[in-house]
């Protein structure tokens, strides 16, 4: 069983660095394409300020020169979902579960264990980077599928732009999750609720060593409970009353 989570734009580098590992050939090809952009070109590519683009340019060039600092990916990314994941003071069993079951899907690194070394960078599958004439999605599709072809159960906490990198055959094995709030009988869903809940849900998976869909249904976390009446066999819905 594998649990898939996306990358995040926000990063925290106020961490002890760890040793890098060599980039896979598929990652190196992506980096080579990204490294062709000047700082001013990155400004429009990323749709960010000149200051932010200059910072990203330095990050890319450091990776290219193999001088970039690397950090455990799960701790480097620091978006709302990540800030709601238990990342410190893990028991030995929780650490083992994290290492064996939780994987990050990256447009630069591929599908990698959550604690893999990563350098600060910005790239997702909505960005129109051409890699040897291919889109990012088509460049990665075979590698993404290969990473999961032996899995019977895949828990996806990904957004659609990450899920659609995988073939239909792999997506057919995915169990997806929706998190909603019940406000006086009205069910609401928005990105802040979803991101926080994904992090809390992953924490519950880790703490309870969940291996099956049945075990996931029984979880009660951060006020969320499973709603069978709203769920499908491979699309579980959790609701929090507020």
Curated annotation (Swiss-Prot):
Show the disulfide pairing.
none
Gene Ontology biological process terms, A to Z = response to hydroperoxide
Q: Which domain of life is it from?
A: Bacteria
Which Pfam family, any one, appears in the UniProt record?
H2O2_YaaD
InterPro entries associated with the record: YaaA (IPR005583)
List the record's Gene Ontology CC terms alphabetically: cytosol
HAMAP family linked to this entry: UPF0246
UniProt similarity note: Belongs to the UPF0246 family.
Protein name as it appears in the record: UPF0246 protein SP70585_1589
């Amino acid at each position: 069983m594998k649990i898939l989570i996306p990358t995040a734009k926000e990063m925290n580098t106020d961490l002890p660095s760890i040793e890098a590992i060599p980039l896979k050939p598929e990652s190196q090809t992506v980096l080579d394409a990204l490294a062709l952009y000047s700082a001013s070109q990155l400004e429009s590519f990323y749709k960010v300020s000149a200051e932010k683009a200059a910072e990203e340019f330095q990050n890319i060039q450091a990776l290219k020169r193999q001088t970039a600092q690397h950090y455990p990916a799960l701790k480097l990314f620091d978006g709302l979902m990540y800030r709601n994941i238990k990342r410190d003071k893990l028991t030995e069993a929780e650490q083992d579960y994290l290492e064996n079951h939780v994987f990050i899907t990256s447009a630069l690194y591929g599908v990698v264990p959550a604690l893999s070394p990563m350098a600060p960078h910005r790239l997702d599958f909505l960005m129109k980077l051409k890699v040897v004439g291919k889109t990012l999605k088509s460049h990665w599709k075979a590698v993404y599928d290969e990473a999961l072809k032996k899995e019977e159960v895949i828990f996806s906490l990904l957004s659609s732009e990450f899920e659609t990198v995988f073939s239909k055959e792999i997506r057919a094995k995915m169990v997806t999750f929706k998190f909603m709030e019940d406000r006086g009988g009205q069910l609401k869903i928005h990105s802040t609720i979803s991101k926080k809940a994904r992090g809390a849900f992953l924490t519950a998976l880790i703490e309870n060593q969940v291996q099956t869909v049945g075990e996931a249904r029984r979880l009660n976390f951060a006020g969320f409970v499973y709603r069978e009446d709203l769920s499908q066999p491979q699309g579980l819905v959790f609701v929090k009353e507020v």
